Swiss-Prot record:
Homodimer. Belongs to the class-II aminoacyl-tRNA synthetase family. The keyword Cytoplasm applies. Keywords: Aminoacyl-tRNA synthetase, ATP-binding, Cytoplasm, Ligase, Nucleotide-binding, Protein biosynthesis. This is Histidine--tRNA ligase 1. InterPro entries: aa-tRNA-synth_II, aa-tRNA-synth_II/BPL/LPL, Anticodon-bd, Anticodon-bd_dom_sf, His-tRNA-ligase, HisRS-like_core, HisRS/HisZ, HisRS_anticodon. Pfam families: HGTP_anticodon (PF03129), tRNA-synt_His (PF13393). GO terms for biological process: histidyl-tRNA aminoacylation. It is found in: Cytoplasm.
Length: 426
């Protein structure tokens, strides 16, 4: 007999789990649409050439791409994010009206390490805006993140930076261009591995000891600086551009009333090579999950590269991990039922079928009907285990008086109510 098991890094979600996951998805959709975003769906299966493009995830992500061949021997890949497919859609549809704000919620795949809230098949919830140069777009996406997590009763902080600032700092201390990406990947891990860990990491990447010392000394001096201080500390045009954008973003965050819940982090990099400006990561305030639960940033070069005109198409996005949000919520929240009311017929199946259908047609109630013919005690036990708040018990006596027995499962109380006014009691 075949051994039944899931592929490592994948998971089945049973109904009591999926109820909460659907709640998160609906909260995302509702919030995204409140900000004027339009829905989009892209294929899970893509050409490998697209997913491995140099302006995409960079060398690190190439190791995690799931690849396959079709019967025509074409090299294909499962998408590892929703950003590159979105950029492809914009590049293929030059008549899209800009600015274009889209959201997509879908499965992505990465053959990477597995940890709490992180799987190899997972769902991302993305919003991207193309056609806006102003960092007002970043501010709006950050405000949207706070609204989404407020809806889900989760408190967050957002760390942010600007890649122009970071690239300018490295340029000003004479880090060679070909080593910049390696240094950025090391600096991006500073909160996890500390300054000594950064030194060790850059040395392992082939950086000289002298250069490693320069990097570490620069990091230590930068940690004491405010955003405005960087202009004086580093006489570099990229640093100046980064500071200007960061100061403008900060003004918008103050105007939106969210600045106090954000943190400027000069070494936040979002390792991916595609980012050109603002970058940010979202964390739970209580750190019940230590990894980020959302992230994003500005990437102005990808669409132009795909279209072959190498023009800038100003684009900024944000992405939330549904699975890691689910992990956070499942630690705090009692799983709610899929039904509001459960109807138990006692020899009155036909009439109960009609009553259930009438309630579904005339109210917004979610109604489940006892179909298995269980005795009253077993049916009530089922409703209790499923956290269904109300039960209707309908026998011949009730039908003869046009009433039903309404049982409040939380309180354990019962009352007879007229069928005609049933919806008022639920």
């Amino acid at each position: 007999m075949m051994e039944m098991r899931n592929v490592k890094g994948t998971k089945d979600y049973l109904p009591e789990e999926q109820v909460l996951r659907n709640k998160i998805k609906r909260a995302c959709e509702d919030t995204f649409e409140r900000y004027g975003c339009k829905p989009l769906e892209t294929p899970t299966l893509n050409m490998y050439e697209l997913m491995s493009y140099k302006y995409g995830g960079g060398d690190e992500i190439l190791k995690e791409i799931y690849t396959l061949q079709d019967q025509g021997k074409r090299e294909l890949a499962l998408r590892y994010d929703l950003t590159i497919p979105f950029a492809k859609v914009v590049a293929m549809n030059p008549n899209l009206r800009l600015p274009f704000k889209r959201y997509e919620i879908g499965k992505v795949f990465r053959d990477g390490p597995i940890k709490q809230g992180r799987f190899r098949e997972f769902i991302q919830c993305d919003v991207d805006i193309v056609g806006v140069e102003s960092v007002m777009a970043e501010a709006e996406l950050m405000a949207m993140a706070f609204e989404l997590f407020r809806t889900l009763n989760l408190e967050i902080t957002i760390q942010y930076n600007n890649r122009k600032l970071l690239n300018g700092i490295l340029e000003s201390i004479n880090i060679p261009t070909e080593l910049t990406s390696d240094v950025i990947l090391s600096l991006d891990k500073i909160e996890k591995i500390g300054i000594d860990g950064v030194r060790k990491d850059v040395l392992e990447r082939g950086i000289s000891e002298e250069m490693a010392d320069t990097i570490c000394n620069t990091v230590l001096s930068c940690l004491k600086l405010t955003i405005a201080d960087f202009k004086e500390a580093f006489n570099n045009p990229l640093v100046a551009d980064g500071v200007n954008e960061l100061q403008q973003l900060q003004q918008y965050l103050i105007a939106l009333g969210i600045n106090e819940n954000t943190i400027f982090n000069p070494f936040l990099a979002r390792g991916l090579t595609m980012y050109t400006g603002t970058v940010y990561e979202i964390f739970l305030k209580d750190r019940s999950i230590t990894s980020s639960i959302g992230s994003g940033g500005r990437y102005d070069n990808i669409i132009g590269a795909f279209r072959g005109d190498n023009m800038n198409y100003p684009t900024v996005g944000i992405s939330f991990g549904l699975d890691v949000i689910y992990t956070a919520l499942s630690q705090k929240e009692t799983i709610s039922s899929t039904a509001d009311v459960f109807i138990i017929p006692l020899g009155t199946e036909l009439q109960c079928l009609q009553i259930a259908q009438q309630l579904r047609s005339t109210t917004s109630l979610k109604v489940e009907l006892e179909l298995a013919g269980r005795k009253l005690k077993r049916a009530l036990n089922y409703a209790n285990k499923e956290n269904i708040p109300y039960v209707l018990i309908i026998g011949e006596d009730e039908l003869s008086t046009n009433t039903v027995v309404l049982r409040n499962m939380k309180e354990g109380s019962e009352v007879k109510v007229p069928i005609s006014s049933l919806s008022r009691y639920l």
